[in-house]
Each structure stands twice: as structure tokens, then as C-alpha cells.
């Protein structure tokens, strides 16, 4: 099943392949490829091959100075964009791919895609963003410390928030608009969000996409969902919408 991909990469093939397109997954910040097991199983059921790998999203994996050798920028966002691009290069057997990215790491995937559209204009046919990215990165950095990392001390959260945010990117996601301007006209994108998301507000996600008329984007709004729990807790809403979107990509 697996070739020798770096970063524990796995190419997981559908039992009955019905599409030539590969679903390329990028997990959420400081997550793990195993967290996407349900997503991979579902797209396999639909007849799509899937690819997953582990991000190098800990500062120590970059000697505490994450840096992009492509964009020449410091910050975890830009370093992860390089890693994502490297894995895309390893999958040249698949001429067409669909990007499926989670939370604010979807912004890293957008950075990679904006670069690649120049030389690989037909490679990435569509994008799915689950629970992100958000336009207000300082806010989501604060909520990351509170909700995901469980930091209870208010003074410590206030001190740590700018460290986390600027360690991600000094652009603080203002560069997402420049990335999206590079996307092709009428580019298909599905934005999945939970109305009860405590980390990235749906309105902050809308702020990313609404200015861009070249993006043909659709929303899947889950009124009872929080951050990243749509497929796990609300499969009856999540699965049909995802299947319909994928099947619309010809």
C-alpha cells in the first residue's frame, strides 16, 4: 500500500477507484495524520485515492527558526508551505489533485497553491477547507492557547499570543488575500464551518473568501458543530455535502 514517502506519508488507495483525482490531505496544526482516518475512509468509499502525511509543525523540528527557502520568509506558515509543496512534487503520477486542509493550516496550503498555479495550472482542481482559515490570526492564536493547549493563566495567554502569532507569520494571514488572487477564475472551493467553533469564527472565515470573485465557493454550515468535529459528530450533514462537492468536480 505504501511507498517510501517522507514524514510518514501514506498513499491510501480506494478499493474501487472511481476518479483519477487524488485527495491530498493536510492536517491541522500540531495534529497528526491519524486524526484524518474518518476523512480518508470516506473519500476512499467514494472511490478516491488519498494521501496523508505528518506536518513538521513543531518549532524544534526547524531548530526553533522556521523558514521558507522558497519565499525567503520566516514563520511556521511559510515553512509548512514548503513541506506541502515537496509532498505534492512526490505525487506526480496524479495529474489532478483536490486539496483538503484543516483549520489555519489551510492558509499554508493556499500559499503553496498560489505558487504552483503558475507552473502547474491544472494540478489542483479544487479545495476543501474545514474550520478555517481565519482572517483574524491574533484572535485564533489566543483561542488556540486557551482551547487546544489548555493554558488557564490569562496573563500567560496574553504574553504568549503574539509569540505564537508572529512565529506563524508576521503577515498574520493578511497574505491570504494575495494567495487567493492567484487562484484560477471560477476555482471551486468548499468551506466547512461550525457555528459553535470557539477557535475560528465563521465570520472570520468569510472575511478570507468574500473579497475574491474568482473563487467559486460554497459553504457547509453546521449549526451545532465546533472546531473540526463536523464529520465525527454530524456525518449525516457532512458526508452528503462533501460527496456532492467532490462529484461536481469534473
Residue ranges and their predicted role:
Residues 57-91:
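Catalytic nucleophile-loop/oxyanion-hole region of alpha/beta-hydrolase
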Residues 2-64:
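Short, surface-exposed "cap/lid" segments of acyl-processing enzymes
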Residues 25-26, 130, 222:
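Alpha/beta-hydrolase
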Residues 28-29, 131-133, 195-196:
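Residue-level signal for short, function-critical loop segments
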Residues 92-103:
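Alpha/beta-hydrolase fold nucleophile elbow
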Residues 108-118, 127:
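Short glycine-enriched nucleophile-adjacent loop
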Residues 122-167:
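Hydrolase active-site cap/lid region
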Residues 161-243:
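Serine-hydrolase catalytic core
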